[in-house]
Amino acid sequence: MLSCLGLAFLLLSLLIVQPQVLSCRVGDQRECDASPFVPGHNLIGEGFDMVTMQRKGAYVIDMETYLNPNRTCTLCSNQLKGHQLQKVILIKVKSWTRACSGTITLMIAAFKIFLCVKYASARLDVVGTQSTVYKFASNMMREDRYTFSTQKRMFSHYSYRVSAAPPFSSEFLKDLARLPRYYNSSTSSHYKDFLHTYGTHYIHQVRLGGYVARVTAARTCLSTLNGMSSNDVHSCVSMGIEVGLGNFKLSNVPSPCSKFLQNHGFSTVFSSYIHHHYTVISGGNGWSGEFSLTHNDSLGFKNWQHTLKDHPDVVFFFLRPIHLLIPTKTKRVGIKVTATKYLEDNAMESSPREPECTGNTPNLARNCCPQQVLKGTLRVTSIRAWGLNGDYAGATERLANKRLEIFVNITDVINSDYPYWNVDYNFGKVYTLQVLAVEIWDEDLQYDDLLGSCVRYLSQGDNSFTCAAESGRFEVQYTLTCDPYLTGERCGHLSH
């Protein structure tokens, strides 16, 4: 199984880990009973569900036994806690680490979903389809095209791993013993229940500490309209993170990015925000993980950071399939089959790539996003009039004059009080907030008389309108076609 912390085509890890030499010794039972456990001792050996991306709270490995058969244990000096002696369970304590900070940034391509795991050769993005982050991203993508970017600030203090032959927890052994020996259609429900309790994998190795991750969903085409690529969005949010954590000033942020961070100042007809975010926090206490991107809002972050040594949580882990632990071959096969089916049933097809438009299509960027809104193609298809009174010379001579702003197109002269111009005037690309002005004239030898005029705002689709003349009326028919990926009455909205 190939695991990937999600959707990424770029992953930059700047975490600096500084391991300390462990100082451990053997303690007798009296010392062992009196000493506290190492922080987060129970955050390893736990079952894990790869679909929900959540720990199950049920332990595969015995995480409480700390005494060896000779009634001794291992006591280690925790340099992060004033060299306090702390006991370890029968696992491997790899190292303490100094409180070390760094930023793990993750550029996430549009249309893709977090927390993907390639499962075997199924060619499916499997994992996390029931996780809260996945649901956030899915809900965003139902609404519009989004580009996702994640910034994570991580602190790692402790590192543990399960020993080569770990002792099983008593509950795990009992549930395993109750499991039918063979997997088939009549026993499959028992295997599903077992999977529901313990998950698909177990945590084999961990780094403990804390992290806060901010998942930003930015409207792809709205960003493009305002001159920001997906890379620009990612860099901008990264600068906003530094502003919020007190490492940068908003005044030093370029103007387009500053407006982006403040979610305003974008010259479109949209009323909705250009970006939304979802926050995930692990470890520590006393802070929700929320902070501003436009001013120094770092107090909660700094206070939370100080709580991580006493209240660590998993910030990085290695998983192993539970079935690899099962000693009985038939049960091992049954658990593997059940887990495989569960993962495949909750998988999604591989996320589509961001569309790419090539060629010379006007008003369309390479990512198939409009470069301007309120743009379309205008065609006037017919004009007809009735009941017009012309000059005294006989049948009235008529001239239809259509214009859009300074663009003027003049029809042929028709000698009738009921003229009909079956025409196709293509005005080409127009700004849809302009108006269509039509004038009907009576052409004379000396002076032309204006018989009627009309002005209308444009609307998308096939349209007609009727206007009054000095006597009679006239009707105009036209078609306004929005540019690709634009919609709305005046082509002012982005289509999904």
Predicted feature descriptions by range:
Residues 337, 341-370, 389-392, 459-496:
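Acidic, phospholipid-interacting surfaces centered on C2/C2-like domain membrane-binding loops
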Residues 1-12:
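Classical eukaryotic N-terminal signal peptides for Sec-dependent ER targeting/secretion
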Residues 390-472:
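Peripheral membrane lipid-binding modules
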Residues 244-246, 259, 285, 387, ...:
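Generic "edge-of-domain/loop-turn" microfeature
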Residues 378-380, 436-438, 476-478:
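Hydrophobic beta-strand residues in large extracellular and virion-surface proteins
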Residues 4, 16-381, 386-388, 421-424:
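Membrane-permeabilization and membrane-interfacing ectodomains
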Residues 231-237, 374-376, 396-398, 434, ...:
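Residues at beta-strand starts and edge strands
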